From Swiss-Prot:
The protein's role, per its UniProt record: Catalyzes the attachment of proline to tRNA(Pro) in a two-step reaction: proline is first activated by ATP to form Pro-AMP and then transferred to the acceptor end of tRNA(Pro).
Name of protein: Proline--tRNA ligase
Family affiliation: Belongs to the class-II aminoacyl-tRNA synthetase family. ProS type 3 subfamily.
Underlying gene: proS
EC number: 6.1.1.15
GO terms, molecular function: ATP binding; catalytic activity, acting on a protein; proline-tRNA ligase activity; transferase activity
Entry-linked SUPFAM superfamilies: C-terminal domain of ProRS, Class II aaRS ABD-related, Class II aaRS and biotin synthetases
Gene3D superfamilies (alphabetical): Anticodon-binding domain (3.40.50.800), Bira Bifunctional Protein, Domain 2 (3.30.930.10), C-terminal domain of ProRS (3.30.110.30)
CDD domains with a match to the protein in the record: ProRS_anticodon_zinc, ProRS_core_arch_euk
PROSITE patterns listed in its UniProt record: AA_TRNA_LIGASE_II
Domain notes: Consists of three domains: the N-terminal catalytic domain, the anticodon-binding domain and the C-terminal extension.
Catalytic activity of the protein: tRNA(Pro) + L-proline + ATP = L-prolyl-tRNA(Pro) + AMP + diphosphate
Length: 480
């Protein structure tokens, strides 16, 4: 192996040494992204985009199963629309990118580059809705948004990112609330079943909720370094936007009413979460459901008669059921290929050589445990299918164990400070529910309330931070 090849495969900073550099090394060396000339605007390369496509395909199917339809709304939004909902514009104003010229001519009105689409969608809904018979509106769009971030990191916080945003209208508050929680549950199911990423679900505090929302619900995941990642949100917007945009319909009694509105979204930051939950010092570890290549076949001693033919035969047997690739490159050794595919996180590697052919077997290597076993070629399809299922279950189990080991209960502010300094992670504590107390905690420690979980625990009767009567048990953490 040449020095260049050795560096390409092995030079990943250990996560225990420098987690941020480990993350950067992994995304670069596995060819997920590249940096563009504009800060914060990343290029998602084919391997990274294939991961997003697999997430997108899974979720799009779930959306359609629950009655939602896809559409597309414009990228540019007139400033006057953004100003219609005061709380919303105040929340997004620092992050908005503006278009001021068309060609060489200054525009009569500034246009903002979509940071989120509530305003333009509500403007259109006001024209489309007339009667209660039109409801519910169940629409989603897949697009990119721009939020001018000062500090950026690929997938986790970028000035442009890909996402989906659903926007629905309903007759009653109860229907809107049911929709909000239904979509949050779809996100949770996607995170745990597809991404093997355990999440805590709950409600955001008033301080942390979406600008203009009646209530925001979230799913929060814990990364290897003990920081939290907000992995998806679902908002009950009440009648805030529908009133501001004069969206009305004639109800069953012929009276004009404002409908109730929801919005919900997840983005490519899920990919950052997958990397930081499952990855190790060899590189990516991808859950089978999203891996661009689920199975890679590497011939050993491919120059020997029959080896390459058998490898092609195995690929043809597997390709209709699995995403499979045959690495028949003749300018790299099998050992180099093993290291490269491990770094790229492919769940299963099949090794086939002359002795394997003689014994009617292949060696199956699993990326999650770095173990290999011989499997009869007669049982190959069944063995691969079972192993992929085992890998997904094992990744979820290990991620839950990691999260639980990094989750702590504290009773006092000093105790939380000590825990967060020594061993960052999720902290569970009782909280009074007051904004001033929450702001004090953040100002003192940089720790935020991640959510008020649906599954409440009684850890005491007083707030851990100010001593007042406690209202909720909350999860806190430093976050991306």
């Amino acid at each position: 192996m040449s020095k260049k090849e050795k560096q390409f495969v092995e030079e990943i900073t250990p996560m225990e040494v420098d987690f941020a550099q480990w993350y950067t090394d992994v995304i670069k060396k596995t060819d997920l992204v590249d940096y563009s000339p504009v800060k914060g605007f990343m290029v998602i390369k084919p391997y990274g985009y294939a991961i997003w496509e697999n997430i997108q395909n899974y979720m799009d199917k779930r959306f359609k199963e629950t009655g939602h339809k896809n559409c597309y709304f414009p990228l540019l939004i007139p400033e006057s629309l953004l100003k219609k909902e005061a709380e919303h514009v105040e929340g997004f104003a620092p992050e908005v990118a503006w278009v001021t010229h068309g060609g060489n001519e200054e525009l009569a009105e500034r246009l903002c580059v979509r940071p989120t689409s509530e305003t333009i969608i509500c403007e259109m809904y006001s024209k489309w809705l007339t009667s209660y018979r039109d409801l519910p509106f169940l629409y989603n769009q897949w697009c990119s948004v721009v939020r001018w971030e000062k500090s950026t990191r690929p997938f986790l916080r970028t000035s442009e990112f890909l996402w989906q945003e659903g926007h629905t209208l309903h007759e009653t508050y109860e229907e809107a609330q049911a929709e909000t929680l239904q979509m949050l549950n779809i996100y949770r199911e996607t995170a745990e079943n597809l991404l093997a990423m355990p999440v805590v679900i709950g409600q955001k505090s008033e301080k942390e909720k979406f600008a203009g929302a009646y209530a925001t619900y979230t799913m929060e995941a814990l990364m290897h370094d003990g920081k939290a990642l907000q992995a998806g949100t679902s908002h009950n917007l009440g009648q805030h936007f529908t009133t501001a945009f004069d969206i009305t319909y004639s109800d069953r009694n012929g009276e004009l009413k404002h409908p109730y509105h929801t919005s919900w979204g997840v983005s490519t930051r899920l990919i950052g979460g997958i990397i930081m939950v499952h990855g190790d010092n060899r590189g990516l570890v991808l859950p089978p459901g999203i891996a661009p290549t689920q199975v890679v076949i590497v011939p050993v001693a491919s120059h020997k008669e029959g080896v390459l033919d058998k490898a092609n035969e195995l690929r043809d047997r597997l390709k209709d059921k699995f995403r499979v690739e045959l690495d028949d490159r003749d300018n790299y050794s099998p050992g180099w290929k093993f290291n490269e595919w491990e770094m790229k996180g492919v769940p299963i590697r099949i090794e086939i050589g002359p002795r394997d052919i003689e014994n009617n077997q292949a060696m199956l290597f699993r990326r999650d445990e770095l173990e290999k076993d011989a499997v009869s070629l007669d049982d190959l399809e069944e063995a691969v299918e079972k192993l992929l299922e085992d890998i997904n279950n094992n990744l979820l189990y290990k991620a839950k164990m990691m999260r639980d080991e990094k989750t702590y209960i504290v009773k006092t502010f000093d105790e939380m400070k000590e825990v967060m300094e020594i061993k960052p992670g999720f902290v569970k504590a009782m909280w009074c529910g007051e904004r001033a107390c929450e702001e004090h905690v953040k100002a003192e420690t940089g720790v935020t309330i991640r959510c008020i979980p649906f599954e409440q625990e009684n850890l005491g009767h007083t707030c851990a931070f100010c001593g007042k009567e406690a209202k909720h048990m909350v999860y806190l953490a430093k976050a991306y």
